Amino acid sequence: VSPVTMDDVTSGFNIGANMSTDPRFNGIIGFSEREVRDMLSYYKDVDMLAGEVDEVIGVMKPWYDNYCFSRDSLHEPMYNSDMVLYFLNHYLPLKKVPENMIDNNIRTDYNKLRHLIRLDKKMGMNASIIQDIVTNGETVGTIKTAFPAEDLAKPDNFKSLLYYFGLLTIRGTKWGSTLLAIPNLTVREQLYSYLVEAYRSADLFSLEMDRLGMLVASMAYEGNWKPVFEYFASELKRQSSIREFIEGE
């Protein structure tokens, strides 16, 4: 739930309090690693877990862990509980890791993300916020507890919305501001794939989707981000030249 407010409409939010970054509530939604280990140990004790607890944790952690909702709770990263239960629902009966590590039910609504990308495009900034995030895996900003809809395109509000959508999490501090980062491989894959689809749907330029898909997969799973942006740059240059020739610019 995002804290977008309508200042010109009485919404009732003036009697509420935003607990999103209160360290006392960091662990209220999700599983701590101790809780995940206890759960796996139980299934191991009743002979339902095919692998060792540490082995299964090693598989789950990069995909489902690393959510933090307060700068004072960096020592207490949380697992997404829905993702953990999705994994166990497949792993326990089949005795193997699911082929698809991502539950479709947790995917951010595509239309929401497409709207965010359009907002990002309209900002007119020298460097796209989303491009900065997918390039570096992190960004700095201030998490806003509330902001009106008409101010959504302001950088800190935009980054805050990505945080409230679960696409960014608190990683620490940098330059006196909050360091926000992509939490795990699930969100990384989700963000990359939706970016590609949104750019394609917006008809910003046409791409060889098979080739781009391979580059994006390499970026998501192996961290090879440079070839993706080199491909974008070459296609932008090529297609801009064609458009200028056609339009006589």
Report residues per predicted region.
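Phosphate-binding site recognition
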Residues: 1-249
